[in-house]
Swiss-Prot record:
Disulfide bonds join C33-C60, C352-C435. Pfam families: Glyco_hydro_18 (PF00704). Keywords: Chitin-binding, Developmental protein, Disulfide bond, Glycoprotein, Secreted, Signal. It is found in: Secreted. Glycosylated. InterPro entries: Chitinase_II/V-like_cat (IPR011583), Chitinase_insertion_sf (IPR029070), Glyco_hydro18_cat (IPR001223), Glycoside_hydrolase_SF (IPR017853), Glycosyl_Hydrlase_18 (IPR050314), IDGF (IPR015520). This is Imaginal disk growth factor 6.
Length: 452
């Protein structure tokens, strides 16, 4: 009897073990970390050098180094800061790719475009979009492919991220009642103007460009991804069923739906997960993801973009004192952050310093803490505000990402079984640990939620 009982127990244990072995394993969620090298040349607390970047790599599966660009006339892929990137200067390209020796599981990609390839010449605004001009030129596409391949191979990158600078949607106000009638993506029109009269041609040409890059990369097993920049209409420029064949993954810029630059008179949630009432139904993470899924992009290739910063507006005496968005009668004149040094954007440590803490609890006026408003439903995100005083001064309203809301988006990625999260940008996370003495808190929160 004892032997028989032991045999039964053994069979049960074997059956349990077999069921574990045969159980389907969910694919690993990826974390793509962007590093804008422009932060390397900043002065002050916003300067992120490689030694301070390195601790982040234990949490990243991919590091995307930004940004390269293209020459207008030659269509060559080039460094946007040769003194910083190339061997003749500080040699940051090689410094970054050599990090693979210490972190062999991290793949390091070079990104092209990213809304950072800005021509400063006073006549540049009158010139055509050089990214569209390149697409229209077969010779230009070939030259780009050859030169970008050379950059990637010469400096030891594992692949390329194509953050193509397509024309952006024009800001469009959606008034009460209109939001429910506004269906799908606009195929040609955005707002009251045509974004690109030749969008169908450019869509085909962009597909051809990605195909050619992938063909050049394939013998070396180099990676190829694309970043859909914020407020670029995917239906205009991405032939999704075609391009996914050439891409290892897609990073969606699912943030900056509202910014002070685009919406100087109305403050609202910059990156909600789900649709809000009486808003444009496409201005949220879920709508962007669903569009790519509906067009046959594998869920495993989609990475949801999460920002590490906030978008601030200045409140006026006409903005009211409730802070409830959308907030009208605002201005795009919030004070510039001392760390970021960029109008209309606050890094997470800059936002954190504005929230109630022991250093500002009793301060008044321009130094008084903001009132933080969280979203218990975890659908839209957090905001904070300080109403303007009787003189119309010191008012501010910020929509921002923090460790909690970033983790909520990682949770959304897990629920929808997507590929992972793309973090924009390491330089705006609290890489110095100024807020809570923990470095990279947003990055850590995302990684924890993706893996637990």
């Amino acid at each position: 009897m004892i032997i028989k009982a032991l045999a039964i127990v053994s069979l049960c244990l074997a059956s349990i073990q077999a069921s574990k072995v045969g159980a389907p394993q969910l694919p690993k969620k990826h974390l793509v970390c962007y590093y804008d090298s422009a932060s390397f040349v900043k002065e002050g607390l916003g300067k992120l050098v490689i030694d301070e970047l390195e601790p982040a790599l234990q949490f990243c599966d991919y590091l995307v180094y930004g940004y390269a660009g293209i020459e207008r006339d030659s269509h060559k892929a080039v460094s946007l800061n040769q003194q910083l990137d190339l061997d003749l200067g500080k040699g940051l390209y090689r410094t970054v790719t050599r990090l693979k020796r210490k972190y062999p599981n991290v793949k390091i990609l070079l990104s092209v475009g990213g809304d950072k390839d800005i021509e400063l010449d006073k006549d540049a605004k009158e010139l055509p979009n050089k990214y569209l001009e390149l697409l229209e030129s077969p010779t230009g596409r070939t030259r780009f492919v050859n030169t970008v391949y050379s950059l990637v191979k010469t400096y030891g990158f594992d692949g390329l991220d194509v953050a193509w600078q397509f024309p952006k949607n024009k800001p469009k106000k959606v008034h009460s009642g209109i939001g429910s009638l506004w269906k799908g993506f606009k195929k040609v029109f955005s707002g009251d103007s045509i974004v690109d009269e030749k969008s169908e041609e450019h869509k085909e040409q962009f597909t051809a460009l990605l195909r050619d890059v992938k063909n050049a990369f394939r013998p070396d097993n180099l990676l190829l991804s694309t970043t859909v920049l914020p407020n670029v209409n995917s239906s205009l420029f991405y032939d999704i069923p075609a391009v996914v064949n050439y891409l290892d993954f897609v990073n969606l810029g699912t943030f900056d739906f509202f910014t002070p630059q685009r919406n100087p008179e109305v403050a609202d949630y910059a990156a909600p997960i789900y649709e809000l009432s009486e808003r444009n139904p496409e201005f949220n993470v879920a709508a962007q993801v669903k569009y790519w899924l509906r067009n046959n992009c594998p869920a495993s290739k989609i990475n949801v973009g999460v920002a590490t910063y906030g978008r601030p507006w200045k409140l006026t005496d006409d903005s009211g004192d409730t802070g409830v968005p959308p907030v009208k009668d605002v201005k795009d004149e919030a004070p510039v952050g001392g760390n970021t040094q960029v109008p209309g954007i606050y890094s997470w440590p800059e936002v954190c310093a504005l929230l109630p803490n022991q250093n500002n609890a009793y301060l008044k006026g321009a130094n008084a803490p903001l009132i933080k408003v969280q979203d218990p439903a975890k659908r839209f995100g957090s905001y904070a505000y300080r109403a303007a005083d009787k003189k119309g001064d010191n008012g501010i309203w910020v929509s921002f990402e923090d460790p909690d809301t970033a983790a909520d988006k990682a949770g959304y990625v897990r629920t929808e079984n997507l590929g992972g999260v793309a973090l924009f940008d390491l330089s705006y996370d609290d890489f110095r640990g100024l807020c809570t003495n923990e470095k990279y808190p947003i990055l850590r929160a995302i990684k924890y939620r993706l893996t637990n």
